[in-house]
């Protein structure tokens, strides 16, 4: 599979778009359906069409049916007919995490992001945010060295 490596410095995704993406992920964070009040997760995706779709995690009592924020954001975009994802912002509010620590997508979400990128041919930019208002940008290929299936 060949993914299109977008030059993100070439203003394919502008700074205001990145800021809006992170803001959207953080804005919906308060709406998460959590079992406990000590952890909240959300995400927002930016599509090739320029639209932003945000979503929160939806925790199930059994945990096996839990939908993660990243999964829900991808589904939200797909429900609107948009599967070409340029970037995803991940936000979290977790009391047991150190101040300033970034939350990475779990491996299930990384797999789903990989499959989304594989279908569209676009390598997704992942924007991690922390509770200090800082962000860290990582291309999907830098986060996952050996995706499956190749």
Predicted regions and their residues:
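Short, positively charged and aromatic/hydrophobic N-terminal segments
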Residues: 2-8
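C-terminal binding/interaction regions
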Residues: 13-31, 83-150
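A short glycine/serine-rich beta->alpha loop
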Residues: 55-63, 95-99
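Hydrophobic "anchor" residues
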Residues: 51-52, 135
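A short mixed-secondary-structure module that forms the rim of ligand-binding clefts
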Residues: 60-79
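Short loop/turn motifs at secondary-structure junctions and domain boundaries
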Residues: 34-37
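Short beta-strand scaffold segments in enzyme catalytic cores
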Residues: 40-47
